[in-house]
């Protein structure tokens, strides 16, 4: 009976505390940050908590709920990004597996480092950008996070309605730091097209990359479509940074016409005349519209001689291809890396590819053989700067393995196919020239 009365008395105290008389300000000794106020219960003064301003949260008001980007290297980033660059969820800093790592929520300096009872990305050890622990198989790995640098997020000065197609121009300057390479956003490669194939039942899978050469035309590789040549099977996305989720401002297109090169052939390894054209049209009947994330790429000039950059030139490749040839899945985030053009004399040496490489092809590789195009990058762009304009110099075609020594990536040499492109697109307005 006494125990019951004591329990009822405790309930009365708790209820009365919840009816407006529970809060009593105490000295700010509970570590509240960002203007938070340390509070306690009127009847249980040993229980403290932080009353946070509207845009902050967390036990100590240390989480900035309004922060969507990081500054510098992100050491002081306190936002709520919680996935890595492949879309995998971060582990909580107070989870049992993370408590065995160097950085976790139970460290004496956890609050200063932004660590706590959450799984938000942080940079406690001053790496180049925010990161988190991710469960990969049986291991917990440090992975960079899907959050952009504030310096890369500046809005264009011109309103969208004033934008026009200006081939080879982009709003962001890439930071070079596919196999190796760096995750990027579509603003760095706004001409990149992601091509998917429909399956019975409604599912879609990523097939290949492509490049927007005019508002209505995307160029890619014939080998991507040779086994399934029906145009109705394909859809094309422009302005997309992630493989299986939407990007703000992206556009979706049906394929109105699919043109495969009539002289395409494939040997044991090499692909010849590996080029294709896709005429795109939205359900509303429109071609692509220029934006911060959608832009055309320049084609080589038909009147320059030579019309390709010199061997040794650094060029960019972009795609959703596998990071290693043994990987089962494609990465979720778009990747970009830099390779250098390799001379035909070198690429035709016996320990490279010998006679399999023709003058309608280009070779490109990383001098250290650490980065390369790989499975899934096919059809995507090899882009080089020519007279200040990013120019489609090659199309990802074939190669042996990925980033193997003396086995560079081989690309369709776009300059050799300009008459073919123009004869089919009949673009004479300068956008595809």
Curated annotation (Swiss-Prot):
<dbReference type="Pfam" id="PF00051">
    <property type="entry name" value="Kringle"/>
</dbReference>
<dbReference type="InterPro" id="IPR018114">
    <property type="entry name" value="TRYPSIN_HIS"/>
</dbReference>
<keyword id="KW-0420">Kringle</keyword>
<feature type="modified residue" description="Phosphoserine">
    <location>
        <position position="157"/>
    </location>
</feature>
<keyword id="KW-0720">Serine protease</keyword>
<keyword id="KW-0964">Secreted</keyword>
<dbReference type="InterPro" id="IPR000001">
    <property type="entry name" value="Kringle"/>
</dbReference>
<feature type="region of interest" description="Connecting peptide">
    <location>
        <begin position="151"/>
        <end position="177"/>
    </location>
</feature>
<feature type="disulfide bond">
    <location>
        <begin position="374"/>
        <end position="402"/>
    </location>
</feature>
<feature type="domain" description="EGF-like">
    <location>
        <begin position="26"/>
        <end position="62"/>
    </location>
</feature>
<feature type="disulfide bond">
    <location>
        <begin position="315"/>
        <end position="384"/>
    </location>
</feature>
<feature type="active site" description="Charge relay system">
    <location>
        <position position="223"/>
    </location>
</feature>
<feature type="disulfide bond">
    <location>
        <begin position="90"/>
        <end position="132"/>
    </location>
</feature>
<comment type="subunit">
    <text>Found in high and low molecular mass forms. Each consists of two chains, A and B. The high molecular mass form contains a long chain A which is cleaved to yield a short chain A. Forms heterodimer with SERPINA5. Binds LRP1B; binding is followed by internalization and degradation. Interacts with MRC2. Interacts with PLAUR. In complex with SERPINE1, interacts with PLAUR/uPAR. Interacts with SORL1 and LRP1, either alone or in complex with SERPINE1; these interactions are abolished in the presence of LRPAP1/RAP. The ternary complex composed of PLAUR-PLAU-PAI1 also interacts with SORLA.</text>
</comment>
<feature type="domain" description="Peptidase S1">
    <location>
        <begin position="178"/>
        <end position="426"/>
    </location>
</feature>
<keyword id="KW-0597">Phosphoprotein</keyword>
<dbReference type="InterPro" id="IPR018056">
    <property type="entry name" value="Kringle_CS"/>
</dbReference>
<comment type="similarity">
    <text>Belongs to the peptidase S1 family.</text>
</comment>
<keyword id="KW-0645">Protease</keyword>
<feature type="disulfide bond">
    <location>
        <begin position="32"/>
        <end position="50"/>
    </location>
</feature>
<dbReference type="GO" id="GO:0042730">
    <property type="term" value="P:fibrinolysis"/>
</dbReference>
<keyword id="KW-0325">Glycoprotein</keyword>
<dbReference type="InterPro" id="IPR000742">
    <property type="entry name" value="EGF-like_dom"/>
</dbReference>
<feature type="disulfide bond">
    <location>
        <begin position="121"/>
        <end position="145"/>
    </location>
</feature>
<feature type="region of interest" description="Binds urokinase plasminogen activator surface receptor">
    <location>
        <begin position="33"/>
        <end position="56"/>
    </location>
</feature>
<feature type="disulfide bond">
    <location>
        <begin position="347"/>
        <end position="363"/>
    </location>
</feature>
<protein>
    <recommendedName>
        <fullName>Urokinase-type plasminogen activator</fullName>
        <ecNumber>3.4.21.73</ecNumber>
    </recommendedName>
</protein>
<keyword id="KW-0245">EGF-like domain</keyword>
<feature type="disulfide bond">
    <location>
        <begin position="69"/>
        <end position="150"/>
    </location>
</feature>
<feature type="disulfide bond">
    <location>
        <begin position="208"/>
        <end position="224"/>
    </location>
</feature>
<keyword id="KW-0865">Zymogen</keyword>
<keyword id="KW-0617">Plasminogen activation</keyword>
<keyword id="KW-0732">Signal</keyword>
<feature type="disulfide bond">
    <location>
        <begin position="30"/>
        <end position="38"/>
    </location>
</feature>
<keyword id="KW-0378">Hydrolase</keyword>
<dbReference type="GO" id="GO:0005615">
    <property type="term" value="C:extracellular space"/>
</dbReference>
<dbReference type="InterPro" id="IPR013806">
    <property type="entry name" value="Kringle-like"/>
</dbReference>
<dbReference type="InterPro" id="IPR043504">
    <property type="entry name" value="Peptidase_S1_PA_chymotrypsin"/>
</dbReference>
<dbReference type="GO" id="GO:0031639">
    <property type="term" value="P:plasminogen activation"/>
</dbReference>
<feature type="disulfide bond">
    <location>
        <begin position="52"/>
        <end position="61"/>
    </location>
</feature>
<keyword id="KW-1015">Disulfide bond</keyword>
<feature type="disulfide bond">
    <location>
        <begin position="216"/>
        <end position="287"/>
    </location>
</feature>
């Amino acid at each position: 009976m006494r125990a019951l009365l004591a329990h009822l008395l405790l309930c009365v105290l708790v209820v009365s505390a919840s009816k407006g008389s529970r809060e009593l300000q105490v000295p700010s000794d509970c570590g509240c940050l960002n203007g938070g106020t340390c509070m306690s219960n009127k009847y249980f003064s040993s229980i403290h908590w932080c009353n946070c301003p509207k845009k902050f949260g967390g036990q100590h008001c240390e989480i900035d709920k309004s922060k969507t980007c990081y500054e510098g290297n992100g050491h002081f980033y306190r936002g709520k990004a919680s996935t890595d660059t492949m879309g995998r969820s971060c582990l909580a800093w107070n989870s049992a597996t993370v408590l065995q790592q160097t950085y976790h929520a139970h460290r004496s300096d956890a609050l200063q480092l932004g660590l706590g009872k959450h799984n938000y990305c942080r940079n406690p050890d001053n790496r180049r950008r925010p990161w988190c622990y991710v469960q990969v198989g049986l291991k917990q790995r440090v992975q960079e996070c899907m959050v952009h640098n504030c310096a890369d997020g500046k809005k264009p000065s011109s309103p969208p309605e004033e934008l026009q197609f200006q081939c080879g121009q982009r709003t962001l300057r890439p930071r070079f730091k596919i196999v190796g390479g760096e995750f990027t956003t579509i603003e760095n490669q706004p001409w990149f097209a992601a091509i998917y194939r429909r399956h019975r039942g409604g599912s879609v899978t990523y097939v290949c990359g492509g490049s927007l050469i005019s508002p209505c035309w995307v160029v890619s590789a014939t080998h991507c479509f040779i086994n399934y040549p029906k145009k109705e099977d394909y859809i094309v996305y422009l302005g997309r940074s992630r493989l299986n989720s939407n990007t703000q401002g992206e556009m979706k297109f049906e394929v109105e016409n699919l043109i495969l090169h009539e002289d395409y052939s494939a040997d044991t390894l090499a692909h010849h005349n590996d080029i294709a054209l896709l005429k795109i049209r939205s359900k509303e009947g429109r071609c692509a519209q220029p934006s911060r994330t959608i832009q055309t790429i320049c084609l080589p000039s038909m009147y320059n001689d030579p019309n390709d950059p010199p061997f040794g030139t650094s060029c960019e490749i972009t795609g959703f291809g596998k990071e290693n040839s043994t990987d089962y899945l494609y990465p979720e985030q778009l990747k970009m890396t830099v390779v250098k053009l390799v001379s035909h004399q070198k690429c035709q040496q016996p320990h490279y590819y010998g006679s399999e490489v023709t003058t309608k092809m280009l070779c490109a590789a990383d001098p250290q053989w650490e980065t390369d195009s790989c499975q899934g990058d096919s059809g995507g762009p090899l882009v080089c700067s020519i007279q200040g304009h990013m120019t489609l110099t090659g199309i990802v075609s074939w190669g042996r393995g990925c980033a193997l020594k003396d086995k560079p990536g081989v690309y369709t040499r776009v300059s050799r196919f300009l008459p073919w492109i123009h004869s089919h697109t009949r673009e004479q307005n300068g956008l595809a020239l």
